[in-house]
């Protein structure tokens, strides 16, 4: 059954909705009653206005004219029109307005009925009429004390045929108006009651009863919104407890850290995703797990068997402190190379300037730091990692070589020993030489100035052009005295440096050799890449090494003197020199692949020849002492070779090395 166009909402919010259409079927008689009452009011209003105007036109008496309730008729007609609109558009506001007008019409109709009825009785009582000119004057039938015109109680009626007919017509009109006003009052009262009942009944039903949706061609099919919950249901549901929705689960952020991603973060200034998450609450991995070392590789920092009585070393005039809370590692920039070329991917630079550095601790700390923009960088000088000191001048253009396999004549110990590494080598001045930011070097405060300051090194040429050393010859510091012994143990649990006793000194000298991890031949890496870096340190009275938890704890040490090493013949500095001028390629093999076997204790060889003995723990000292700092970290292959190559190579290699370019050779 299709609803009529009048089926619309009747809610208090005056909006058409499905709820209004639902109750139209139930309350159709109420709507018909509204329509009927509206029409009756309109009709009564018209009649009241008409009779009142006719009655006022018949008589000339001012009191009767003023008492004709024409104003009640106008209000009654207007109220009826609103009633008809409320039937057409049964909005709550329209119905409420109709009920308000109905109440007003009740009052006006009552007043008009009283006035009209009074005038009708007056016309009925004035029966004695006389024609005076063109006006009929009627007086009451009861004899008055004074004449009728003098008393003012006369009725003047416009003459028709006779005066009695004119008086009767006026009387009938006034009674009609009186009856109409009374009927209007009754109709208006009914209209107000019906409107009030409809308003409150609809609101009461919608409040206490659930709703039913009615869909039809006139209704918005598929577009109806769910009605609000009824008040009755809401009141009944108050006793039911509805638990709140729990918050979403919290997952802590993942902190990823690896050496390769740290290096790439430095190079590209961005974060890299890593498949290995490290949470702040997790314990850091062991040093052996990170570096792929055996447990016995951290027995001691300086092996006493490496001590040789015939060896001479420079005195260390600086104190090495372990800063547990030092600053971040910053990549050391590589100087401009002549010819507009740049270092290759695997070029590494490492230099030792007379300070004992705990490389293992630095490597451990640098790997464990999470995404701080540091990997394997170097920053040295007489200052901490956070202390800025302007460089005196731009470092000279570094000398480079396309091979690390050429031996070099030992330079004077006043100059730092440059590290040979992949493809191109950088020779740095002493004021910008790399060091480890976890280890600070400070001049002693109480013992006077150091006897051997870092000398200024002149710019050098390519190793293929000159076979001289990196420092000018002739700079020879005095010979030192024989130092007392010192043994520096290396702990498994803590990668820092600890001292065995306060009175202990350096007893041993060490010669550590870093060997090539893998020789890669590709379009990017052409040539041999040997990361064998030779560190020379002779017997010398050592500074006291302190284990510090902050960078503020320092201890002054006495000043020492440096002892020069005798210089040998100037060697070649490039692979081209070796191939062109040297007889044989055994030296290239010797520098690329260094033996792991223990050398002959006889120590035969040329002057200055030093055999590197096998360490007590079965591995060369390079893994626990030296750190290869990556010069170009844009490729992940270099770091992968640096950090994981040690686990891949477990074969036996030669370990024999000549400091002064001796003729001793060993096979691969």
Curated annotation (Swiss-Prot):
Location of the region described as Disordered in the Swiss-Prot/TrEMBL record: 386-419, 442-503, 550-570, 597-620, 645-668
Glycosylation sites: 160
Ranges of Low complexity composition bias in the record: 398-407
Mutagenesis or variant effect for residue 358 to F: In a breast cancer sample; somatic mutation
PTM-bearing positions, type Phosphoserine: 358, 389, 493, 574
Residue stretches of biased makeup (Polar residues): 655-668
Domain of life: Eukaryota
Record carries keyword Glycoprotein: yes
Record-annotated membrane-spanning stretches: 34-54, 67-87, 91-111, 174-194
Pfam assignment, any one: CD20
Keywords for this protein: Glycoprotein, Membrane, Phosphoprotein, Transmembrane, Transmembrane helix
GO CC field: membrane
Subcellular localization: Membrane
Tissue: Widely expressed.
GO MF annotations, alphabetized: WW domain binding
Topological type in the membrane: Multi-pass membrane protein
Complex formation: May interact with WWOX.
Family: Belongs to the ENTREP family.
Protein name: Protein ENTREP3
Organism: Homo sapiens
Classification of source organism: Eukaryota, Metazoa, Chordata, Craniata, Vertebrata
């Amino acid at each position: 059954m299709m609803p009529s166009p009048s089926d619309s909402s009747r809610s208090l919010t005056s909006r058409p909705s499905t709820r209004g259409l639902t109750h139209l079927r139930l309350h159709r008689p109420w709507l018909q009653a509204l329509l009927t009452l509206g029409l009756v009011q309109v009709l009564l209003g018209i009649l009241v206005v008409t009779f009142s105007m006719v009655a006022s036109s018949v008589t000339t008496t001012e009191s009767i004219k003023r008492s004709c309730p024409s104003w009640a008729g106008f209000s009654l007609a207007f109220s009826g029109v609103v009633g008809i609109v409320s039937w057409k558009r049964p909005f709550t506001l329209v119905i409420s307005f109709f009920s308000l007008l109905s109440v007003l019409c009740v009052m006006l109709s009552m007043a008009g009925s009283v006035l009209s009825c009074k005038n009708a009785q007056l016309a009925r009582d004035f029966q004695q009429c006389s024609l005076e000119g063109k006006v009929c004057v009627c007086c009451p039938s009861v004899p008055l004390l004074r004449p009728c015109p003098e008393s003012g109680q006369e009725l003047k009626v416009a003459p028709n045929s006779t005066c009695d007919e004119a008086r009767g017509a006026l009387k009938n009109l006034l009674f009609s108006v009186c009856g109409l006003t009374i009927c209007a009052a009754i109709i208006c009262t009914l209209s107000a009651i019906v409107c009030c009942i409809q308003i409150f009944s609809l609101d009461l039903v919608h409040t206490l009863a659930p709703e039913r949706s009615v869909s039809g061609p006139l209704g918005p099919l598929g577009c109806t919104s769910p009605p609000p919950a009824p008040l009755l249901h809401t009141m009944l549901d108050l006793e039911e407890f509805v638990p709140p929705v729990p918050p979403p689960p919290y997952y802590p952020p993942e902190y990823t850290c690896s050496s390769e991603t740290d290096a790439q973060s430095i190079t590209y200034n961005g974060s890299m995703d890593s498949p290995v998450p490290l949470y702040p609450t997790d314990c850091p991995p062991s040093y052996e797990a990170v570096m792929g070392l055996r447990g016995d590789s951290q027995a001691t920092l300086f092996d006493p068997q490496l001590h040789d009585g015939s060896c001479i070393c420079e005195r260390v005039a600086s104190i090495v402190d372990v800063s547990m809370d030092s600053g971040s590692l910053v990549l050391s920039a590589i100087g401009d190379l002549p010819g507009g070329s740049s270092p290759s991917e695997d070029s590494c630079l490492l230099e030792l300037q007379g300070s004992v550095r705990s490389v293992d601790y630095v490597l451990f700390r640098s790997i464990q730091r999470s995404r701080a923009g540091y990997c394997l960088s170097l920053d040295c000088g007489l200052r901490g990692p956070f202390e800025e000191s302007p460089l005196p001048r731009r470092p000279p253009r570094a000398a480079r070589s396309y091979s690390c396999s050429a031996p070099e004549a030992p330079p004077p110990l006043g100059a730092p020993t440059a590290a040979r590494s992949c493809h191109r080598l950088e020779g740095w001045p002493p004021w910008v030489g790399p060091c480890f930011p976890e280890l600070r070097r400070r001049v002693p405060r109480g013992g006077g100035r150091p006897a051997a300051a870092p000398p200024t090194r002149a710019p050098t040429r390519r190793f293929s052009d000159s076979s001289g050393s990196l420092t000018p010859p002739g700079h020879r510091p005095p010979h030192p005295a024989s130092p007392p012994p010192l043994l520096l143990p290396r702990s498994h649990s803590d990668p820092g440096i600890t001292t065995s006793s306060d009175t202990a000194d350096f007893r041993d000298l060490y010669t550590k050799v870093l060997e090539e991890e893998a020789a890669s031949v590709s379009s990017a890496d052409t040539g041999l890449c040997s990361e064998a870096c030779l560190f020379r340190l002779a017997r010398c009275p050592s500074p006291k090494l302190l284990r510090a938890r902050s960078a503020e704890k320092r201890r002054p040490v006495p000043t020492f003197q440096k002892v020069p090493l005798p210089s040998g013949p100037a060697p070649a500095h490039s692979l081209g020199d070796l191939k062109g001028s040297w007889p044989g390629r055994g030296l290239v093999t010797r520098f690329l692949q260094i033996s792991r076997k223990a050398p002959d204790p006889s120590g035969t060889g040329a002057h200055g020849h030093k055999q590197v003995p096998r360490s007590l723990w079965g591995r060369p000292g390079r893994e626990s002492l030296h750190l290869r700092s990556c010069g170009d970290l844009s490729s992940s292959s270099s770091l992968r070779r640096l950090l994981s190559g040690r686990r891949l190579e477990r074969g036996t290699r030669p370990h024999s090395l000549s400091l002064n370019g001796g003729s001793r050779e060993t096979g691969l």
